[in-house]
């Protein structure tokens, strides 16, 4: 890991079907945040489509093909990956949780206050790539 990787947070994982809440800093997005009370942290969940198992498998393939992604945990419909930046090695913690027709997501920077929209852009890029894979 790079110089600015930080420590892995202790609040990762799903508890009673819920991922950890975002802190007040703007460097986190989550599909389980209330979109009306906290729109700056809210991002829509990924669509699991008509076959959630196929979508989950596609998500895992997509992550495996992405540079600087380390899948740390993949069990029982929960996946946790670390994404690192190429230059300074900043690490973001990204979680995916299967929930029927949705895949809930949480993406948060370990260090700093602002992420300049990187976490939101990452989830939207994954959403776009999954949709493209599903249409093939």
Each PLM stretch: what is its role?
Residues 2-136:
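Ser/Thr-rich, low-complexity intrinsically disordered terminal regions
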């Amino acid at each position: 890991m790079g110089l600015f990787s930080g420590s892995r947070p202790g609040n990762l994982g799903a508890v009673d079907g819920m991922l950890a809440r975002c802190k007040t800093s703007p460097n986190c997005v989550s599909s389980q945040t209330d979109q009306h009370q906290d729109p700056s942290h809210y991002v829509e969940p990924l669509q699991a489509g008509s076959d959630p198992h196929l979508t989950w498998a596609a998500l895992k393939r997509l992550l495996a093909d992405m540079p600087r992604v380390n899948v740390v945990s993949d069990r029982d419909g929960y996946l946790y990956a670390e994404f690192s930046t190429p230059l300074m090695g900043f690490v973001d913690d990204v979680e995916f949780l299967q929930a029927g027709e949705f895949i809930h997501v949480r993406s948060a920077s370990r260090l700093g206050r602002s992420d300049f929209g990187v976490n939101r852009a990452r989830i939207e890029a994954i959403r776009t790539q999954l949709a493209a894979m599903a249409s093939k």
